[in-house]
Amino acid sequence: MAGEIAIGIDLGTTNSCVAIKDKVIENAEGARTTPSVVAFTSDGQTLVGAPAQRQAVTNAKNTIVASKRLIGRRFKDNVIKGIQRDYPYKIIEAKNGDAWIEAGGKSYSPSQIGANVLIKLKEAAETYTGKKVTKAVITVPAYFDDAQRQATKDAGRIAGLEVLRIINEPTAAALAYGLDKTATTKNIAVFDLGGGTFDVSILELGDGVFEVKATNGDTHLGGEDFDRMILNFLVEEFKKENGMDLKNDPLALQRLKEAAEKAKKELSSTQETDINLPYITADAAGPKHLNVKFTRAKLESLVSDLIDRTIEPCKKALKDSGLKREEINEVVLVGGMTRMPAVVKKVTEFFGKEPHKGVNPDEVVAIGAAIQANILAGGSDAQDIVLLDVTPLSLGIETLGGVFTKLIDRNTTIPTKRSQTFSTAEDNQSAVTIRVFQGERQMASDNKLLGQFSLEGIPPAPRGMPQIEVTFDIDANGIVHVSAKDKGTGKEQTVKIQASGGLTEEEIKKMVDEAASKADEDKKRRELVEAKNSAESLIHSTEKSLSEYGSKISSSDKQSIDDAISDLKSVLAKDDASLIKEKTDALSKVSMKLGEAMYKESQSASNDPSPKNDSTEEGERVVDPEYEEVKDEDSK
């Protein structure tokens, strides 16, 4: 594995970023971040990033944004209703009960949508390195649960990547920030407010060790929620002025969402901005326009509750870390929303110090992931770093009366393993069903069900006699594994958690094949476009040259060129790249006669004696002017 290329990817709700070692890689459009947007067009194309974003207004129902908010979630989760209300695309219930997306007449898992973004980032890395890239470290919000982490890992597999590690976004940011700052031990807080999620992590840095002390967060709080508050305000303002509700107009809503996001960004550096959307809708009286003066003060009043929601997780993380506010040496801001002055002010007030501003909040997570990827891939220049992360949520089982019994507490350093001995509740019981949950609530049903398994084939015995040791294991990715052993017989059994949701191996394989097939289609489509562009360019230049130099070649040569142009034009309408290339080559070959004529013309022109600049026409008289120097008296 040593020396292999491994990339770091920040798969974000709003934007994503890819890096190698400590360098951020630009995408095909030349941008350092890629919008996490995927669109399905009527002609069967899949657009990713900025091209998808640009057509969102006219194709809102088939343009998928913020799919990270759906990843690893059940359709019946409370947050799904809110997401369905906020976005124009359709969310459906998959056969396994997960939330999926319907677009372009097909259904997609959120992992598939994420995979499309990952493929674009992977291709950018391959273009940059000139080599095939198959390994990556992908980041997730620290507060992602097991299902969300597994679904993110699945997205990587669908994209053709071996996911070396899933790491927490704040931890990755700390890695990038603190790489050259581990000579002395210091405590840092990473405040990560991104497009869709919020995390805060408390870490101790020193002697090459990055140890996460505690983490907390909210997987449904981010820039998308800020945008929604602005959008709702604009809808109400328009309704007051015009008596029309824009909430049922998908086209208008998409324009409003884009305007809201733009205004939010502008107000990070200015006090006031104009939101001007002409022809936003129309009624019998004619077109309607939206024009609103929007101030920073108004924005801050609209989103103050959202900003306040970040403080409670900060308090919990500090408490769990065992540190006081004054013991935090540095506060690092991550995520685009931390550019908002009101957010910076709130963080400063809580921690009692100005946040560190030496990192790019949009790129630092990808850089940290790339540093970790380089270490795991055995890069020759990899630094000797130990990364100790934690599990964000407690892991346990349902016991008598529906109580949640914790086996691994939140903020336990991972990887970790815990064992618990169980027995039977009835005489001669041959099987035990164990339900595994993740969360912090007292009752099991209030937490996230990861899955359940049945341990079968227990020898007949009075109740309470069999000794079944069940081991819960959380790996370095934060993903849960379970095994069981019958202590009485010494026989070990492999137990697989039958998760109630998530993708099966068969589904993942099918999606991997679809992604590979789609990549071939995309390659063929690109080759066709390039072939047509080359053909049209050659036709234009040949016709131009023919009009200028056609008289310099024989009529038979001219006819051959005309025929070749006609042949090429006739195949342009066909979607056959090889045929277009064949006819392009034929035109290129016969038009060489034109090139020869042009060359001869330029040669003869350069051999003609050019007129002398100092020659005078016959009869022209050159008169030398007479002048007298006049001296300035004042200069004496």
From Swiss-Prot:
Task: Mark the residues carrying the PTM Phosphothreonine.
Answer: T197
Spans of biased composition, class Basic and acidic residues? 514-530, 614-624
Q: Which UniProt keywords apply?
A: ATP-binding, Chaperone, Nucleotide-binding, Phosphoprotein, Stress response
Q: Where is this region: Disordered?
A: 514-542, 598-636
Give the Gene Ontology MF terms in alphabetical order: ATP binding; ATP-dependent protein folding chaperone; unfolded protein binding
| One of the Pfam families matching this protein, by short name | HSP70
Please list every transmembrane segment annotated in the UniProt record, as residue ranges. none
Where do Polar residues bias regions lie? 601-613
InterPro entries cross-referenced by the UniProt entry: ATPase_NBD, Chaperone_DnaK, Heat_shock_70_CS, HSP70_C_sf, HSP70_peptide-bd_sf, Hsp_70_fam
In this chain, composition skew of type Acidic residues spans 625-636
What turns on expression? Answer: By stress conditions e.g. heat shock.
Stated role: Acts as a chaperone.
- NCBIfam families (alphabetical): PRK00290.1 (NF001413), PRK05183.1 (NF003520), prok_dnaK (TIGR02350)
Tell me the HAMAP family matching this sequence: DnaK
**Family that this chain belongs to:** Belongs to the heat shock protein 70 family.
Write the protein's name.
Chaperone protein DnaK
What is the organism of origin for this protein? Answer: Neorickettsia sennetsu (strain ATCC VR-367 / Miyayama)
